[in-house]
Structures are given as C-alpha cells and as structure tokens.
Amino acid sequence: MRSIKLHRLLDLVGIIPSLDLIDKEINNISFNSKEVQKGTLFLGMPGLNVDGGKYCIEAIENGAEAAIIGSAAKQKIGSIDRERILVIEDNLDYIFGQIVSEFWNRPSRKLKLIGVTGTNGKTTITFLLEYLLKKLGKKTALFGTLFNRWPGFSEVASHTTDFADKLQKKLNAAVDAESEFAILEVSSHSIAQNRISGCEFEAAIFTNLTQDHLDYHSDMESYFQTKRKLFFPPYLKDKDGISVLNHDDLWISKLSSDLEKRSSLVSTKITKSEFKNDGFFYVTDKQFTESGSTCIFHTPKEKIKLFVPLVGEFNLMNAIQAITILYKLNFSLKDLSKLIQSFPGAPGRMEKIEIDNNDVSRSLPIVIIDYAHTPDGLKKVLQSIKKLCKGKLITVFGCGGDRDRSKRPLMGSIAEEFSDHVFITSDNPRSEEPQQIVNDILMGIEKREKITFDIDRFKAINESIKFANKEDIVLIAGKGHEDYQILNDKVINFDDRKIAQKLLQEKSKSK
C-alpha cells in the first residue's frame, strides 16, 4: 500500500499543516467523499455544476485525515475545522493533479507516455499504437474512450480521459505491471479541467481540429488554444518531447511554427517538393480499396511501401501519424510497415458487420458502423465510402442531446450531400426532446424526398437495411462502439453492431 507523510503533499502548495497533521500518513487520495476511508486525503474538486469542496465535512466524517478545498467552497460552507480542512485560493484542479501525481510517485516519469489529442481519430490511433508496440514486444498500457488496460488488467472506460485521482492511480498500476509505454487519449475537457496535471509526455499527436464541443468551448479559437497546451510544458517535455502534427489541418498547421524544429509534420495531401522541412513525412502513390489503402511513405531519410488495412484517406492519415511517432521513438520503419498490415482496427470505427454465412453475405448490402458524430467526421467517412460504393449509399445518424446544437444542421447537410438516402434518428437524446433534435438536423436539408426520419433508432436501422440492396452500403453513424442509449435519466442497452448483425442475419434468411 502506498503511504506518504501529509506534509510532503502540502509542501507542494505551500500549506503549513498543524502539528497534529504534520506526520499523518496518507495512503489514499480521492475527489469523492463517498470513497473516503481512514488514511485518505480528500480533495474538493470544483466541477461544472457542483463544487466538490462542499462535501469536505462529509469526507472528514467518513474518515479522511484532511481535506483541501477552494475558497469559493469555504464561503458557501461557513464554519469549518480549520486544522483538518485546508483552503487554497485558486488553480485547484492543476494543484490537485500535482498532489495526486506526487502521491503516486510521479508515475508518468517511469513510462514513455504518448498523448493523442484532436477532434477525430484518437481512438483509432491509440489502438494502433498499442497494437504495434505490443507486437514489438513492449509492455504497453492504454487509456481512452473504450478501455483502460495494461498487462494483467482491463476495464471499460467511463471517460475518454479520467480525472487526476483515478488517472494517476491507474498510471501507477501500469508501472507496477512493468509497462514501458502508456498511450493516452487526451480530450479537450481533460486539458481544460487539468485532469492531466502531473502527467509528463514523451510524445504527442494532434490528429485534427474540427467543430465539436462548442457547447463547452466558446468558439473554435478557444477549442484550439485548449488543445495546443498539450504540446508545451508542463505537459510535453521541453527539450526532448516529440510532437507529430497533421499538417493538412489548417488549425494545426498554425502550431508548427510555435514548436519550431521539435515537431514532425505529416501530410497525405502535399509532397516534399512543395514543403521544405527536415521533419516532414508524406505519402505518394496513394490507392484506396475496400480492404484499405496503399502508398509510398516518405520520411526525411527513407521511404517504404505501406499497406494500411483501414478504409479511407482519413485512416491513412491516422496510420502514418502513429507510424511517424514510433519512428521518431527509434523503431524500425521496416518492422512498423510489416506489423501494421495485420491491424484489426478499433471497435466501432469503420467496422464492417459480418454474418456467419459468407456465401449469402455476398448478396447483401454492406453495413458499416462508425463513431462519426461531428460534421467533419461524418463528411470524411461518407467521402471515403462514396468512392467505394457501387450502389446506393444509405446513411443512418442522429445528434446527441444536450450538446452543441449548431452542428446539427451542418451534419444534416453533409449527410444529404453525400448520401442517396438518409435515415435521421436518435443518438443519446438525453434530456432533450428527440423530435426537436431531428427538426434541428432537418434545418440543414434541402431535398426532403431523400429523407426518412424515425426517432426510434432500432426502427431506423431496420428500415435502412430493408431498404438496401446488394452493392448498396449502409453507414450507421454516431455511436460506434457504444452499447447503450441515453434517454432522459435512463440508460438502456443498445448496440448498433449487434442490432445490425441480427438484422442482416434475418435478411440473409430471406435470400
């Protein structure tokens, strides 16, 4: 069990404890007063809706040795035990991350920590990095949207990026399991809320930046400024930190000049002759098929033929960013190009639904599940599928409730532009009226004759598969790997992949 003197943690924030507290042993840290037990230091984290500091008295009653809260929480509570409930003025979330990291003995310093941020592509890239590193014989931990896992342990993730108390504890567990590398999906929320405070990154990837989370960030500039923080101290190491940037993205290209020579730029659009930079990685001779893409991948020193078993140019970009960062970490390009050929992909990312009877499946439409839930994500997926589709392209999608409303008509317009028919339905409506979300999407659509809408997602998927014929492709977008639907305060079982597979199986029996 981890144990540390309380005064060592308080020294980080300049708090001098009372004589009664100075030698107290702390064996746990928590942001949750209900998880507190004897030996715990409770940190009252301010939240979007509730200030966790208000629960400090409950935490002490539950056995916490001490609690640290902000001055705002103190004003609301009034009288407190000043010896055991300690108050700091500001920057709580950053300070709390440092305290937790110190408690767990700075685990990121014992790992080669790679962060992946961006609007789209994070999960595919982190899965690919984990896959390649494990194939290269490296013990690797993965933290992200789908799973948190390391040698001997795996759990379903509750957040894309955990809060600092959980994250640092899990990083320490990965160290204890002798992990050498850790791959971390880094959301914009986690940067803004300092969940990654205390993490020191060996390397970082910026995938792309397109409209999302504008219900949280005031505008795209604010969204960008939040993301860019990952690429500078105290997060990315100052001198030796490696950054890989998608040069084809206009927002990200702004960042390269700030990073000077420490960044590697990656492009699927332009070639070396158009760009002079010793850290430039690019592709030529691109070809795209139903099974993936091939290209010649160029580094500043060598080139190699590459097959990426993922559909679409956006996935080619994902792949070469992953390969570039491992190449910069001194792995062999030849080994990487060989190993990527067998990468199975990430769940719910351009995932083709298979049924048992292969002979019958040839007479059925292709059904693809993808997590695309932003305008740019949906556009790139549809553009990639459109190039390969021999028949009709049929799209099923919705937009999440209690989230950025401005993207709804944009996604409606994109679905209409690239699809032959669109089924608009529900996608985690949460507390919003599902029909109102559909109406918002319809605001972006001109030709209503191409549109069918049904707020019942099962019915929409069922009708889309019935509607589709051989050589058609049905894209079911928005939920990807998710196995639930959020309706008001209820969470019900709902898995696009299982439902689509069952409906395809039923359709096959009628053939």
UniProtKB/Swiss-Prot annotation:
It is found in: Cytoplasm. UDP-N-acetyl-alpha-D-muramoyl-L-alanyl-D-glutamate binds at S33, T160, T161, S187, Q193, R195. ATP binds at G118, T119, N120, G121, K122, T123, T124. The modification N6-carboxylysine is found at K227. The keyword Cell cycle applies. Meso-2,6-diaminopimelate binds at R403, D427, N428, P429, R430, G478, E482. Its EC number is 6.3.2.13. Its cofactor is Mg(2+). Keywords: ATP-binding, Cell cycle, Cell division, Cell shape, Cell wall biogenesis/degradation, Cytoplasm, Ligase, Magnesium, Nucleotide-binding, Peptidoglycan synthesis. GO terms for cellular component: cytoplasm. Pathway: Cell wall biogenesis; peptidoglycan biosynthesis. It is an enzyme of class 6 (ligase). Its main location: cytoplasm. A motif (Meso-diaminopimelate recognition motif) lies at residues 427-430. Coiled coil: none annotated. InterPro entries: Folylpolyglutamate_synth_CS, Mur-like_cat_sf, Mur_ligase_C, Mur_ligase_C_dom_sf, Mur_ligase_cen, Mur_ligase_N, MurE/MurF_N, UDP-N-AcMur-Glu-dNH2Pim_ligase. Disulfide bonds: none annotated. It catalyses: UDP-N-acetyl-alpha-D-muramoyl-L-alanyl-D-glutamate + meso-2,6-diaminopimelate + ATP = UDP-N-acetyl-alpha-D-muramoyl-L-alanyl-gamma-D-glutamyl-meso-2,6-diaminopimelate + ADP + phosphate + H(+). Carboxylation is probably crucial for Mg(2+) binding and, consequently, for the gamma-phosphate positioning of ATP. NCBIfam families: murE, PRK00139.1-4. HAMAP family: MurE. Catalyzes the addition of meso-diaminopimelic acid to the nucleotide precursor UDP-N-acetylmuramoyl-L-alanyl-D-glutamate (UMAG) in the biosynthesis of bacterial cell-wall peptidoglycan. Belongs to the MurCDEF family. MurE subfamily. This is UDP-N-acetylmuramoyl-L-alanyl-D-glutamate--2,6-diaminopimelate ligase.
